[in-house]
């Protein structure tokens, strides 16, 4: 609460009351609730300060699909895949990068980045190899004609794919090079859900940018209160960008708060 007579803000808990001329809100989002960052402060701020809030949702999280086939291959990863999300047969987003099989879902950098655009009911398309389908089929056929090995071995040797993945993929497709090429360059899954805040690397949504002076990180309508990090409606791709924003916005908020003391 604002105490105009003393020029200070008051924060009242169930045990005591704190008074301060400046406050920095840095309680994080809803991700990793085990650390204490469970998002409860958002409802308090909305109630007491009448702040506009963008709905909170998990960001940079794994994607769960119907009939996920790779539970037994958990831990297997691919360095360069192409991931697409389709909605009503139209491409919503595309990412290139690493893919990881887990016990329950798809993960890895490309999946995490594209999860921000995905919704249940969308189609997830995975290209394990980024090359024209006809080219993949031709290479497979040529290798098969020269080798007496089975298709799993041919697949692994030709494209340097994990052997266990090759074995499972062959068992899930018609025993033909064309069918394998189709699976390698566009295997489709229906998205059932995104993993929740427990597995999300960051939180999307939060205090609307319109409420904040981004030069100082001070709330426009509440002098002396500053915000930083995941509390703000800003989220980025994997690669340290969210951490850097937390550090930079926190530093800006601290320097701005000091000037008022």
Show the residue positions of the predicted features:
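Glycine-rich loop(s) and the adjacent beta-strand/alpha-helix scaffold that form part
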Residues: 22-68
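Conserved beta-strand-loop-beta-strand element in the redox core of flavoprotein oxidoreductases
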Residues: 1-18, 23, 87-89
């Amino acid at each position: 609460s604002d105490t105009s007579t003393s020029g200070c803000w008051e924060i009242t808990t169930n045990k005591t009351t704190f008074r301060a001329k400046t406050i920095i809100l840095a309680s994080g989002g809803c991700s990793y609730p085990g650390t204490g960052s469970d998002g409860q402060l958002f409802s308090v701020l909305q109630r007491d300060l009448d702040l506009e809030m963008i709905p909170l949702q998990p960001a940079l999280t794994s994607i769960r699909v119907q009939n996920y086939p790779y539970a037994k291959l958990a831990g297997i990863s691919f360095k360069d895949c192409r991931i697409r999300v389709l909605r009503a047969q139209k491409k919503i987003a595309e990412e290139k990068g690493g893919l990881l099989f887990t016990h329950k879902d798809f993960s890895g950098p490309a999946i995490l980045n594209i999860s921000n655009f995905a919704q249940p009911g969308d189609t997830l398309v995975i290209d394990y190899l980024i090359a024209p389908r006809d080219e993949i089929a031709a290479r497979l056929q040529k290798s098969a004609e020269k080798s007496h090995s089975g298709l799993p071995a041919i697949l692994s040797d030709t494209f340097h794919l994990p052997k266990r993945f090759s074995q499972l993929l062959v068992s899930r497709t018609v025993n033909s090079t064309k069918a394998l090429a189709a699976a390698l360059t566009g295997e489709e899954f229906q998205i059932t859900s995104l993993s929740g805040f427990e597995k999300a690397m960051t939180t999307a949504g939060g205090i609307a940018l319109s409420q904040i002076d981004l030069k100082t990180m001070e709330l426009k309508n509440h002098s002396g209160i500053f915000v930083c990090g995941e509390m703000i409606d800003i989220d980025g791709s994997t690669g340290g960008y969210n951490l850097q924003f937390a550090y930079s916005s926190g530093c800006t908020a601290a320097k701005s708060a000091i000037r008022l003391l």
